[in-house]
Amino acid sequence: MIGSLVATAFWAMLPAYVPNNAAVLAGGGRPIDGGRDWRGARLLGDGKTWRGTAVGTLTGVVLALALNRIAEPASAALGVDLPTFALPAAFALAFGAMCGDIGASFLKRRSGRERGAAFPGLDQLDFVVVALAAVFVVDTDWALAVFTPSVLVVVLVMTPILHVVTNVGAYALGLKNEPW
């Protein structure tokens, strides 16, 4: 049962897990905040760009559509009924994840934290909370069918663990300047 919940939670969240990584790879371009300050600090910083947001969102949607193509054989192989993604749900998860990360950057700047500085709790769940809120607003029926209370609990427990493991791994490989 727990294996089924973990597989479903991970699969359902992949379109939200991947966009921020894709945004980093796309990097550069014009900052969303246009370089503007508010109360002596940047609104968001150079790390939040229009290009990264667009590429991250598109990557999440394309990933969801690719997952749809392999859902049936993956379900059979894993012995789990994995969900397929309606296009509005895919977009909401991907764009919601990007917006959650942008919102966290805003909060980090307001609290005096620099780009890349740790903000425990917020760093691990910002994108998940906004992605889930977005998908529940945009495609309520799909979200209720996929994100049962048990799956939501697994997502909220699993995500911080995945966040730490992937960030430490990226740091060890020299892909990140800090392990958080």
Swiss-Prot record:
Catalytic class of the enzyme: transferase
InterPro entries associated with the record: CarS, CarS_archaea
Biological process according to GO: glycerophospholipid biosynthetic process
Pfam families: CarS-like
Leader sequence segment: none
Required cofactor names: Mg(2+)
EC number: 2.7.7.67
Function per UniProt: Catalyzes the formation of CDP-2,3-bis-(O-geranylgeranyl)-sn-glycerol (CDP-archaeol) from 2,3-bis-(O-geranylgeranyl)-sn-glycerol 1-phosphate (DGGGP) and CTP. This reaction is the third ether-bond-formation step in the biosynthesis of archaeal membrane lipids.
Family: Belongs to the CDP-archaeol synthase family.
The protein, known as: CDP-archaeol synthase
